[in-house]
Amino acid sequence: MKEAEAGGRRRIEELDYLKCLLIVLMISFHLVFIGDSYPYAKQVVYTFHMPVFLVISGYLMNVQKSPDQYLRTLLFYLIPYLVMESGYTVMASLLPIREHIDQLTVSVFFEKLLLHPLGPYWYLHTMVVCGLAYFGVFHLWPFHPLSRMILLGLVFALLGYWGGVVSPTMAFYFLAGVVIRHSGVSILQVFRPSWLALAAFVWLAMYPVNLQSSAPGGILMAYLFVSFALAAYPVVGLVLRRPLLFVGRNTLSLLLFSPIFTILCKSLVSPLSFEPTGMLFLVVSLVICIAGSLIITWLMDLLHVSPLFFGKQRALISY
């Protein structure tokens, strides 16, 4: 396990690397042209990319912080979520996007904001809801750790199946990360590297029945993706370690701001249509989305907006 000191805490390099791969996949298939051109590949990626993100998030969320520190962390997930989801919802009522809202009323606005978010911001909504439940169970109930995790699972089931506040499947991926954290075992001891994981992943991906994150095959695909990615890291890292880790450490910025650029990149489809596979469009769009999101974050740091929006002086995390 490789660790790096960053901002006064220890970082696991492999997790930053995984987050880089996952955010690039997320942006790629939020490009409508790519999603429409490769629908099966999109379905495969959607089976595992956000579930793995949530496992990592559950593992990294430290409920042993003081209540003030922990709730401050959640607050600065909530503030960007409220700002960006509000903007996205209004935009969805004005632009002819896939999630277009025909008539935006006050009730529809708050239904999207509080219960059923649009765009990629549902991830932050899930993080805040699951994080609050996690805090409540682990701070307010003096149970044995195993009992707390069982209770947390029941709370997630209540919120998901009966309350409709979060996806129960995604909440349980978050719970998996929590369980790993409290097991006393490193996440890299749970997810072991293997080159053969690629063959098993491809075999499972050939059968549509596996392409659901709640299906046994989908859960296994998430594990196999991580296993193969970790096996490839020593090789890929020889050349691309610094840019991969830089992107991986700034996934929040990319999650928040990349939708602005995925919409703008629609205008590139026609000029780049001479390349029939769409790969040129994909590469150019990824550069624009990643660079644009990082530049916005850098400007927010420069203008001292980051303390209000992200809760820290510098939101752009350097290598």
Feature names for model-found ranges:
Residues 1-319:
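Alpha-helical transmembrane segments and their immediate juxtamembrane cytosolic regions
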